Amino acid sequence: MRQDVFEIVSNRNLAPGVYEMVLRGSSTADCTPGRFVQLKLDSFYLRRPISVCDAEEGKLTLVYKTVGRGTEAMAQYECGKRIDVLTGLGNGYDLDRSGDRPLLIGGGAGVPPMYLLARRLIAQGKRPTVILGFNKAEEIFYEDQFRALGIETIIATADGSVGVKGFVTDAMEGLAYTYTYACGPEPMLKAVYNSVKDGQFSFEARMGCGFGACMG
């Protein structure tokens, strides 16, 4: 875990209630796939945990949903603002277990961690397939970014407005894959778990300190 001050480079709306914040700072080396950061926000006692969407030297990308007063305040932050950030939180994914054709599944707020994971797997010569699950067309985000990686990207919407009608498990049918990584709401993860032989799963959850000291 590291503590550093980052500067906002951009903070833009992607979909209703979904924003992408790009930060500039030095402590990005430990922002590996599946890990998260915590941001100290003005006038709020508890830091806000946000999963890492992308990270490279000197730049950190976070994609977040406005689910309360803290994230609603974040959505109003402008370029140039400086934020105190704790990086390197969480265990992250074990990429060595992926095999050649890993399957990456993200549902709603669980989509962002799959992006950095996909990039790192591709860099290792792997050929991931990505399934992104949403309720309806207007909620879709980051589809173009995944497709730009040159990998198979499947969209599933509960109402059938785009892609496969139904849930991510419906989109899994008939796919060949060696291992599974998934992030999203608990009902989705339970359904995926019941459909695969082996995998790693990240839960969306509220938390206090972010590193276990508060036992929350």
Residue ranges of predicted features:
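Ferredoxin-reductase
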Residues: 2-81
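Short cysteine clusters
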Residues: 209, 214
